[in-house]
Amino acid sequence: MMFDKHVKTFQYGNQTVTLETGEIARQAAAAVKVSMGDTVVLVAVTTNKEVKEGQDFFPLTVDYLERTYAAGKIPGGFFKREGKQSEKEILTSRLIDRPIRPLFPEGFYHDIQIVAMVVSVDPEIDSDIPAMLGASAALVLSGVPFAGPIGAARVGYVNGVYVLNPTKAELAKSQLDLVVAGTSKAVLMVESEAKILPEDVMLGAVVYGHDQMQVAINAINEFADEVNPELWDWKAPETNEELVAKVRGIAGETIKEAFKIRQKQARSAKLDEAWSAVKEALITEETDTLAANEIKGIFKHLEADVVRSQILDGQPRIDGRDTRTVRPLNIQTSVLPRTHGSALFTRGETQALAVATLGTSRDEQIIDALSGEYTDRFMLHYNFPPYSTGEVGRMGAPKRREIGHGRLAKRALLAVLPKPEDFSYTMRVVSEITESNGSSSMASVCGGCLSLLSAGVPLKAHVAGIAMGLILEGNKFAVLTDILGDEDHLGDMDFKVAGTTEGVTALQMDIKIQGITKEIMQIALAQAKEARLHILDQMKAAVAGPQELSAHAPRLFTMKINQDKIREVIGKGGETIRSITAETGTEINIAEDGTITIAATTQEAGDAAKKRIEQITAEVEVGKVYEGTVVKILDNNVGAIVSVMPGKDGLVHISQIAHERVRNVGDYLQVGQVVNVKALEVDDRGRVRLSIKALLDAPAREENAAE
């Protein structure tokens, strides 16, 4: 037998999931092919048995890649092969990474790489859940010290009922799109967007997803028992109490002093001073990587212990706040003169400059997804320059973190956007993080909402976001509102909630430990709501509702014409529409149903374009009088062609020019002459008969008799 193949199948919601190993990619530490319906993902895990010199963090790399052949397509563009990772690929890579990372032991610094490749796709079944299950199974089979497996589930909420792993069609009707991942004991990660749902429905979805994923976790465990992989013989380094005492002796007091300093830069400088003292005393050129890492680890633990014990003992936090207080807020709108909408949102030492721009339907982003091409009328881009944390750094393409934070802020605002038929603009928000000390993504939600209102977008409600932290030791725990950067790194859970006064629009959770219960999450969500309402009050005081459209934003005018008139508006080879746009300085889009959208920089230009289109599409009415221009004298003295509207000509027969007998048309009419005509008839082919005579008084009978 060439292949030692193992297969495990289980039912997951309405889908059948199959895990296979031993046939493909046998040189990887472990490889699992996951099928869910027709969606197939191949996940391979490779590991490095040696730790690299100087390695002082856990080097886990996750790459989720979509191949266009999976959907039976050939890539577009010049090169005809897959290029840089798409936003969906980056976000899914993060989705796999986040629940897996905390399950590796502390002090484990071996390289681990996970590559998940989508090789077949069913447009109704998203490949992210199979990729997460595949990564979980492959890690268990690789034998590395991984405290998994994890399960992952997508949860929808349709007509008041939770739906496990909804299809794309079901998601379209769902008020919720939530992905949850966790182990058999605890939830580790949540990523979601919702249409303004109450906290208890959100928490219910998390608990429901965690219950349902146990099927997948059990299946992976059974699969591993069958394959029976060889486990790594890796032991966590034992704590060297003597070394801990040395580090504490050198730096303990300085660390305590540092965490009493409320200003971030000064606090960081004090901590650097403490670390330098430790380095000088204990690390020499001869110290190997393992020993240096041990000292770094002890130092980090000391930092964490100081902050955590202060908070759990009920002492004030690093910056002097209690656990429930939001840092001071400052809100300014319309801060940039030529932009369509702008806001500067400052919360303590975190600040976002958010700018909204309005465009036309031509500005929509075209997304070429595996499941099919679609357009997006709302974009939110998040930028995190190095100066926001007072550092020197490289400016370049957005990093994975920036893509992830931008997507979270976007998901928070989607639920309150006006319907396209009520507001046909394309919207782009850019959030420039100008200062950062904790939860800049939530500052982007608040700033983004304010900038859209400043641009005149009729949002259904104000949206605010808040980042929460949690510290848990034994049976003591503290939930922290509006966490600082330091609290984020030293805490056990970081979760972000965005929403309106009515409910939640986005929830993201990352949990680093296994003991967080439903009750703790409930308390945390309630505390987050209190903070959100406080921020919303201040936002509403600053901007009550949508402002007037900026003078610099395009004006959109919509009108509806008969579908059979579309050809006339476009003209031969697009001639008519080009001349209208050139003359009026507007941009015109025509939909197949006859809806015309005119984008203009001024009201006058928009009205002018609208008038031209109305003239082209207008019908000649029988009995109506028009001012027309003679465009042609017909041969053989038949009559003249008179233009009564743009693109609408009619015939004035020789008998309809005057009451007396006309011998020669040229004696009465010249090309270019302006005449008043009355429409006599429009035949079924659209030909128009006109009369000049009908508007002239008939000569008196006596004069006729006298002649």
Curated annotation (Swiss-Prot):
Job of this protein: Involved in mRNA degradation. Catalyzes the phosphorolysis of single-stranded polyribonucleotides processively in the 3'- to 5'-direction.
Sequence ranges assigned to domain S1 motif in this UniProt record: 623-693
Cofactor list: Mg(2+)
Main location: cytoplasm
Domain of life: Bacteria
Listed name of the protein: Polyribonucleotide nucleotidyltransferase
Source organism (scientific name): Neisseria meningitidis serogroup B (strain ATCC BAA-335 / MC58)
PANTHER family in alphabetical order: POLYRIBONUCLEOTIDE NUCLEOTIDYLTRANSFERASE, POLYRIBONUCLEOTIDE NUCLEOTIDYLTRANSFERASE 1, MITOCHONDRIAL
Listed EC numbers: 2.7.7.8
InterPro entries hit by this protein: ExoRNase_PH_dom1, ExoRNase_PH_dom2, ExoRNase_PH_dom2_sf, KH_dom, KH_dom_type_1, KH_dom_type_1_sf, NA-bd_OB-fold, PNPase
Gene Ontology molecular-function annotations: 3'-5'-RNA exonuclease activity; magnesium ion binding; polyribonucleotide nucleotidyltransferase activity; RNA binding
Main enzyme class: transferase
Catalytic activity from the UniProt record: RNA(n+1) + phosphate = RNA(n) + a ribonucleoside 5'-diphosphate
Domain KH: 554-613
GO biological process, one term: RNA catabolic process
Binding positions (Mg(2+)): D488, D494
Note, other: Present in outer membrane vesicle formulations which are used as vaccines in human.
Cellular localization per UniProt: Cytoplasm
Record-level GO cellular component terms: cytosol
